[in-house]
Amino acid sequence: MRITLGNTLPPYPDFVEGIRRAPDRGYTLTPAQTITALKNALRYIPTEWHEQLAPELMEELRTRGRIYGYRFRPAGDLKAKPIDEYRGQCIEGKAFQVMIDNNLCFDIALYPCELVTYGETGQVCQNWMQYRLIKQYLEELTQEQTLVIESGHPLGLFRSRPDAPRVIITNSMMIGQFDNQHDWHIAAQMGVANYGQMTAGGWMYIGPQGIVHGTFNTLLNAGRLKLGIPQDQDLRGHLFVSSGLGGMSGAQPKAAEIAGAVSIIAEVDSSRIETRYRQGWVGHVTADIAEAYRMASQAMQRREPCSIAYHGNVVDLLEYAERERIPIELLSDQTSCHAVYEGGYCPVGLTFEERTRLLHESPEQFRHLVDISLHRHFEVIKKLVARGTYFFDYGNSFMKAIYDAGVKEISRNGVDEKDGFIWPSYVEDIMGPQLFDYGYGPFRWVCLSGKHEDLIKTDHAAMECIDVNRRGQDLDNYNWIRDAEKNQLVVGTQARILYQDAVGRMNIALRFNEMVRRGEVGPIMLGRDHHDVSGTDSPFRETSNIKDGSNVMADMAVQCFAGNCARGMSLVALHNGGGVGIGKAVNGGFGMVCDGSERVDEILRSAMLWDVMGGVARRSWARNPHAMETSEAFNGSHARDYQITMPYVADEELIKKIVPYIVGK
């Protein structure tokens, strides 16, 4: 048997009107590289079609900057179906088809025709030939095999064993010398590199809900830490301003409303505003800055949650507030600055349509305008912060982009970015010490039956596993899952996000598998965002609160990936650059199918704890106080099977005496 694209050449598709399309990514290959790129694409395609398709694929490369193989895209909307409607030899093979189609459905994907799920450039795979082959391989996959995916390319099925992963994915794992945006762009054009973001290429995206709990936690804790809001109160009467209503950033208005705040979120793309408004993730829309702030002021006076989408550029929005002396309490940004020169950041003064056209016609001019806009963006934030605004980078490489645009003033040491920037990232100030250091992170699950009643049952089961008296974080998480149904978070298939620590995740996972075993619910996919305690190494986000010098090391993410492979997670993924861009992060994730078996129970008992505690242990070794407390307690409660190496903490006064003396000599 040979897996192929079949014997019938599909017709060229009619693109659905109103569905967003990715901009031209830029064609910059040499003639020799172009020849290789075309050969690379044609190797998926039977030779009898080459003469007809070679000019077509070449035109895609020339005009889109990528070869997508549009002809091979299945017609219509690729909505996730109930698992029983997919063909397969094993449950995992069918389950991952659910996840892939969910990543690419019109309600979820940013650019469905270009396989981009979210984050401007985050793809499931590179082209539709790969998609078709992956689907066929998943249909043939057995419990004795593992499917290997390398930057979207299905390398094939390889014999393994039932307690090994069914799918292993890597994306854009480039050699160090070439691990930069320029060389990656060449590799992507040539069809050998896929930017998987995090859960796009890791097949684990669940719509904007996937980040909304983390955003809710961030805003709530920012209010507690910086605005003095008591633990038992929310953000009523307080204003949050940011930008972006895309696949991840679109969580901001919903999270702010759930936290009780008033929010104004700037977005230049009207289609993204329309999507979030239609889905109920933003309450009001205006293109008038004065009206946006007026609506916000009225809602604050009434102490009512309110979300406002401003159709325009965030720089204009902030400069108006600075000029009119309108106080902004909490400020962030979620433009796609990991791809700042590829369209992820729209320069002030350009409409979204002008941005798209300029990207195609004059990428160098576009780059120049981005740099000018970033300078203005920096200057207005600096003025607002001086007046009392709390600004935090939301891990989108925003401050790194400003630094790269030539604003060295933004670096903390005035020399380079190794010590971070003058304003903290949300992980550095909030999520790191308050959540990651304890092991809390974005646990998630998908009810593969597609039944809403299964989701409600799992919500209640998860709620019963949380001890609200243990920590304040547990009470927040309990309230979150209690209100999840009321807050109407589902976009796409039936899924849920819930921040939990290591033991919490394991207990919930075991409870779910027991429910599947008893026939109370259908099979369940467990997973998490790569943006988690252990899953990602990045000094610009996930490990920005690690101060022992190891924030530039990627050992943790790689060990997490390898450990999850060894313990038998159903899917394991390792990527380059998730969230912050190529060369700036190494990130990984997993998927685990709960089929009700005792085999899965054993994997959950081992893998769920490892997946979290490996990161807590690393944070503890960096001398993060809460991680040290958590590791010490874990050593006591799990002494039979685990032992985390604990650091001895040096006396600060001793170090202050010794170092100046030696350096002075």
Give, region by region, the residue ranges found by the protein language model.
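Catalytic cofactor-binding cores of redox enzymes
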Residues: 101-113, 186, 192-199, 217, ...
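C-terminal domain-closing interface element
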Residues: 295-304, 309-324, 328, 626-664
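Core active-site phosphate/anionic-ligand binding loop and the adjoining beta-turn-alpha structural block
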Residues: 290-508
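Catalytic or ion-translocation cores adjacent to nucleophile or general acid/base/metal-coordination motifs
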Residues: 197-220, 224, 236-239, 245-303, ...
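General beta-strand structural signal in soluble alpha/beta enzymes
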Residues: 146-151, 169, 242, 265-266, ...
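Structural alpha-beta junctions
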Residues: 140-145, 260-261, 327-330, 383-390, ...
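Short, solvent-exposed amphipathic alpha-helical segments in soluble enzyme
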Residues: 257-259, 322-327, 407-411, 516, ...
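N-terminal ligand-binding/catalytic initiation module
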Residues: 1-214, 220, 224-227, 231-232, ...
